[in-house]
């Protein structure tokens, strides 16, 4: 294994702070009040399966370098702990157009093994059969489902999110895998409403997601090159 190169990834970032859920955090709305007071976005992610399916998460936008985002995350984590919350994970994602985003597998191999492309696809589904269909498609593409527990259903339809991870590849290959997943979702008749591409540059506790996504290195034969559906981003 070669030497890991520390990059700045200068540009736009999102920092996600996952808080351990408990009765006071979730039911008592303490975290919601704290987030509102500090100008952070609160999302309560519920994974479809895994070791820690309930994941209250605070999100903060930032610009600059990875080192600056890490420093800001340390300060924010200290504030949360001082307020009585247990921060179990800090995850920092760079925009795919930032500096130093890998274009090839060789460039990706120079980075920390925690670095990878991550794609988030929002679906609007109706009924358990569509959820089961989305789950089956996702599992064939190094992806799986989650939902936002704070988002109410709309007109008997509800949102699900598909998260796909692509490791040890450059952005063109990651985009090809995303396109294959989108094509498979469209072929299954599932409605895609949003697509987001990110590049994970820091994750201090990836085991929080243990048992959720069964990651593969190859996309399914027969689904390569499928046409990407039109979406609203």
Mark where each language-model region is.
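Long, contiguous binding/interaction regions
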Residues: 2-233
């Amino acid at each position: 294994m070669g030497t890991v190169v520390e990059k700045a990834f200068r540009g736009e970032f999102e920092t996600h702070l996952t808080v351990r859920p408990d009765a006071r955090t979730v039911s008592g709305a303490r975290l919601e009040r704290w987030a509102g007071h500090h100008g952070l976005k609160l999302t309560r992610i519920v994974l479809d399966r895994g070791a820690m399916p309930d994941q209250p998460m605070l999100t903060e936008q930032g610009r600059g370098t990875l080192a600056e985002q890490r420093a800001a995350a340390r300060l924010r984590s200290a504030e949360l702990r001082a307020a009585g919350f247990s921060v179990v994970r800090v995850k920092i994602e760079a925009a795919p157009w930032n500096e130093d985003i890998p274009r090839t597998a060789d460039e990706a191999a120079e980075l920390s093994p925690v670095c990878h492309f991550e794609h988030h696809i929002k679906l609007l589904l109706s009924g358990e059969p569509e959820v089961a269909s989305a789950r089956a498609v996702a599992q064939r593409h190094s992806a799986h489902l989650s939902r936002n527990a704070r988002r109410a259903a709309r007109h008997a339809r509800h949102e699900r999110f598909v998260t796909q991870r692509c490791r040890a590849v450059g952005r063109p290959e990651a985009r090809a895998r995303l396109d294959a997943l989108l094509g498979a979702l469209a072929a299954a008749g599932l409605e895609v409403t949003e697509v987001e591409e990110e590049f994970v540059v820091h994750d201090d506790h990836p085991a929080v997601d243990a048992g959720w996504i069964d990651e593969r290195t190859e996309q399914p034969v027969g689904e390569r090159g499928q046409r990407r559906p039109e979406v609203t981003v």
